[in-house]
Amino acid sequence: MRVLILGSGVIGTTSAWYLSKAGCEVVVVDRQSGAGLETSYANGGQLSFGYTSPWAAPGVPLKAVRWLFERHAPLSIRPTTDWNQYVWLARMLRHCSAERYAVNKSRMLRLSEYSREALEALSAETGITFEGRRLGTIQLFRTQQQLDGAVRDIELLTQYGIPYEVLSPHQLAKFEPGLADGSVRFVGALRLPHDQTGDCCLFTQRLAALAAKRGVEFRYGCTVQRLEVDGPRVTGAWINGALERADCCVVALGSYSPLLLAPLGLRLPVYPLKGFSLTLPMIDASRAPVSTVLDESYKVAVTRFDERIRVAGMAEVSGYDVSLNPRRRSTLEMVVQDVYPGCGDLGRGEFWTGLRPATPDGTPVIGATPYQGLFLNTGHGTLGWTMSSGSGRYLADLICCRPCEISSEGLDMFRYLVSTIPCPQECAPCVPPTP
């Protein structure tokens, strides 16, 4: 089977890897000069298998109003003329109830835990390295209210058998001694020992190289213009003015996926959630994080790679704008100076922004569509790196009509469709047309 994958970020590349292993002929196209150069380029570096949560959570609507007036708000909204922005925000607000939060988080945890297993197996098989650390992650609470609010998440962690530790300030120093140099005295923390860290871009590029050795063809500098449709089936895509035919197409274009799907009448509720990062050369390892910490107040993570510190986070709903906002840089600098002063060289920091493809409920969109031969792997929001290996392996099983290792409930786009169209997974959409 010939599979055309649109997009070579971490999601498209892991999809290519697993489809190649399943015996498919795989072609990957991307508009950039290499793999992982857009949203996957400089994300937070967290593999947050346990700390997987939707932005749509109880209390967020009231917090969002307060954040409108805060300089260092973790979530900000810049109104645009795009009506889709307001539709997406309204849908997100509907998912902020405790009941919907529990459902959405459980779906995300299911995929994240599967992704952890998939990444461990992939790493063992290939020996791939990506400046990774297996030392857990820590969520830091500045207030008792934040610590008390973690009870809801702890209940779900317990339900899924995910190990965790609630740390006192004294216990916190044992795992992250560098915090002692900071100006903040945290009231407590939640540690997830099975979480990891690593450079997403490095992983993506090295996995692309391994996939290429398996015969996967990567074509860069390619603009995807539209999908080719023949009745109920997608038969390929127009790329740089030429038709590239395939038995199956996978849309892994992140925030740009809805733009490609709209002409087919598919309204995918994925919208850009703009994030920011600052990568610093490390200048004092003793004052740097051991792994990753997340400051809950600002939704900013500080992550250690081999010789670099990555400070990343926040969410700005501002459409497809990729300009660098100096105010966001000041927030990143403020947090790292608060928490780990002197760990990195702020004067030589690389400031970056990326558009994270977010769904209103936080769960990605993976699987079939109403069109035969068209599959999606997008909408992972801030957790694309975390969920990438599991998403790629799960999608390969779907396309190749193999039994999936996790439940497909709530993962495909049909949870959004008010339609009588049956999910074509039931009729093996992966089977190529008869010649």
UniProtKB/Swiss-Prot annotation:
Residues that hold FAD according to the record: 3-17
GO biological process: D-alanine catabolic process
The keyword Oxidoreductase is annotated on this UniProt entry: yes
MF-aspect GO terms: D-amino-acid dehydrogenase activity
EC class (word): oxidoreductase
GO cellular component: cytoplasm; plasma membrane
Reaction it catalyzes: a D-alpha-amino acid + A + H2O = a 2-oxocarboxylate + AH2 + NH4(+)
UniProt cofactor(s): FAD
Pathway membership: Amino-acid degradation; D-alanine degradation; NH(3) and pyruvate from D-alanine: step 1/1
Keywords in alphabetical order: FAD, Flavoprotein, Oxidoreductase
Disulfide bonds: none
EC number: 1.4.99.-
UniProt KW Oxidoreductase keyword: yes
Gene3D superfamilies in the cross-refs: D-Amino Acid Oxidase, subunit A, domain 2, FAD/NAD(P)-binding domain
PANTHER family (UniProt xref): D-AMINO ACID DEHYDROGENASE, SARCOSINE DEHYDROGENASE-RELATED
Family: Belongs to the DadA oxidoreductase family.
Functional description taken from the UniProt entry: Oxidative deamination of D-amino acids.
The name this protein goes by in its record: D-amino acid dehydrogenase
Taxonomic source organism: Xylella fastidiosa (strain M23)
Organism placement in taxonomy: Bacteria, Pseudomonadati, Pseudomonadota, Gammaproteobacteria, Lysobacterales
Gene name per UniProt: dadA
